[in-house]
Structure formats: C-alpha cells, structure tokens
C-alpha cells in the first residue's frame, strides 16, 4: 500500500508517519467499499441475464424489459438528493447500511415477481433503494482522505464496478445452468436470491465495520486522528456560489448532453449484451455468460491505457471523441456481421469496451470545464442528465426490439447517438475552454 501511496505527489513527499496513517485508512476502508461497488453493479446487471429465462415465465416483452431496465434510473434520480440530505443528518454508516440492506432485500424480492408490471415496480424500488450510494461514498471519502488521494481512489472504486461486469456473466451462467429447480426455485429466481443475499450480509457487516468520521474510530491512535484532521482542514475550501448561477451556465448543459449520449451507449451494453449474444445463435447460458464478460475485460484494459495516454498528453477531447466514434462504428457494423459469430463477438467487444471506457474519460472534462465555484452543482446536474439517459435509452431499445424483433437497429440508433455526442464535444467544447491543458500544467 505504501507503493500505491507513492503515486500521489502530496503523500509521497510526506513523512513516513503520514504515509502509514493513510495506508492504514485505505486498508481499513477500501476492501469493503470496493466489494460494495462490485455487488452494487452485479445487482443491477443480473437482470440482463435473468431476462433470458424469466421472459416466458412472466410474459415479459422486450418493450416492458426496456422500461424495467430504465425506470431504475428514474427512482434513483428522484431520491438521490433526499438520500444525500439524510446522510448529512444521520451519518455515513447508517446511510450506507440502510442503502445496502434495502437494495439487497429488493433484489431478493425480485425473484418472486410474477408479472411484467411487478418487475417494473421492483426495478423502480431498486432505484429508490440505491439512490445516494455513489455520491454518499464520494462524500464519505472526503471525511477520511485529502484531495491528493481521493481522485485515484474514486477511479479504483469505478474500476471495481467494472470488475463486476467480468464476474457477473460467468457467475450468472453457472447459477442459471446448475441451480435450476434448487429448493423449488427456477434458475432466474435463484440468480436474484443468490446475488441479493450477499448484499444484505455485507450491509450488516458494514454497520460494525464502518465509522462515520476519523475522530470516532477506535482503530486510529490520537496522533493519527490529529494528522487526518489537520490534513483535511488545511485544504482550501471551494468558493461558494448560488445554484441558480450554475443552472445558467451553458457549458454545463453541453457537457450534460455529451454524457447523455455516452450513457445511452454504455447502458445499452449493460442491459442488452446477453440478449445480443443469444441473437448470434448461441443458447448455452454458461457460454453466454463467459462471452458477456469479454467487453468488460477489454474495457478495463482500455480504461487504463486511454487514461494514461490522456494524462500524459494532457488531452481530453480527442481521446474521448475518438473512443465514442470507435464504439459507434462497431455498433453500426454489427448488423453487417450477421452470420459471422467470431466477427460479431469482436465488434460487440470492441464497441462495448469503447462505450464503457468513455465514462471515466468524460469525467476528466467537467472539473476542467466548470469554474471552481460551480463545479459541485454542475457535476451533480451533469450526472442527473446521464441518469436520465438510463431511463430513455433503455425504453427506446426495448421498443425497437419489440417492433422489429432485432437488436441491430437499436444498436444503430445508439451508434448515431454516440456520434452526435462526439460531434457536440468536439465542436462546442473547444480545447481552450479546458483548464487542464498541457500549457497550464507547468
């Protein structure tokens, strides 16, 4: 962990005692939080695999599935702010425990839906339950870590969510292949039960493991608590601004539109890849699960390489724009590759990895685009616009699939959306508008 800390200049130059303090904090908090991010993502993605079997049992059309996949984000958007306000009142430990227990119970309860409308209601409740989890964790980190550590710690948490995509496919395939009929439950029911129950257990564990703030911990010494308090209190505070001023900032909405386009593509990957793979003529659930992990494996590698290149060259726009265009081109070519399973899998993996990799690339832009006073409010609005894409894009994909019987047209539409986002980025967010260019690095 000390080697990891050497990546952060402010910490690397600190005395060994300070380095030991933050190594201790990271070893205490990060394993739990990364595991929480993994189960969080799995409990979202599992629906895409359950659909392969549950559609016949509950008469779930592709249009209804698209609504169910998207309405999750509506519940999330509506209850995100109240959840964050609640966290400020009662503390992180109670809030994170409450969120994990509720989303775990809703996931398990989804195993017992018998109609499409019940599934849609369950997904809305899941969005309500999860609301505030990601921003709550980000806020929690500000209590424990100085700014020089929080950036890459956040990236590590996002990478943990990506690892869930690698885990969920093979895990779902094994559960649905070997546990059909176990304890009287069908394969898709066992999937929801066995992916939701660990979340409940982890939430209970979090109640005893997490501490709201450093000064309340019994695993830090008095000197270590003093060091953390001193480091965090010495950081310059953000300049205040009225939220109304943030809402009048055009660049925020331009960035929000770009994120909307990116999120439309990445969400389509998350919820429709297993269905797309089965459309290649493959029916074995274990094989589908293994192939569904490929885009996430490629995405993890691409995220690292693209992020490193973007940081080295201090260039954001073309890295992101070209990544989006590669994803869009791969999606558009899928229809032409019908009948060629190997080429279809290659295009699916490349396009999906590009769509997923675009997300961390995008989040290097808002902090550089917005002024310090408006960054916090602007980023929140941009995030909400992205979540709105989760609602609309999946309803659109489901409707197209129901109307045409094919996913290829839906992926063509998502390709056009991603090209639109790339053009908006490159035309309306000029390089000189970003504050972290190479010439400002010196």
Predicted features, each with a name:
Residues 88-100, 311-324:
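Cytoplasmic membrane-interface "Motif A"-like loop-to-helix N-cap segments
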Residues 122-159:
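Cytoplasmic helix-loop-helix junction between adjacent transmembrane helices
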Residues 79-91, 302-315:
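Helix-to-loop junctions at the C-terminal end of transmembrane segments
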Residues 152-176, 198-199, 383-393:
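Glycine-rich segments within core transmembrane alpha-helices of 12-TM secondary carriers
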Residues 316-365:
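C-terminal transmembrane helical hairpin of 12-TM major facilitator-type secondary transporters
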Residues 78-117:
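Conserved MFS/SLC helix-loop-helix module at the cytosolic interface between two early adjacent transmembrane helices
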Residues 59, 91, 112-118, 129, ...:
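Helix-breaking motifs and short loop linkers at transmembrane-helix boundaries and internal kinks
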Residues 47-48, 248-307, 359, 363, ...:
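Extracytoplasmic gate region of multi-pass secondary transporters
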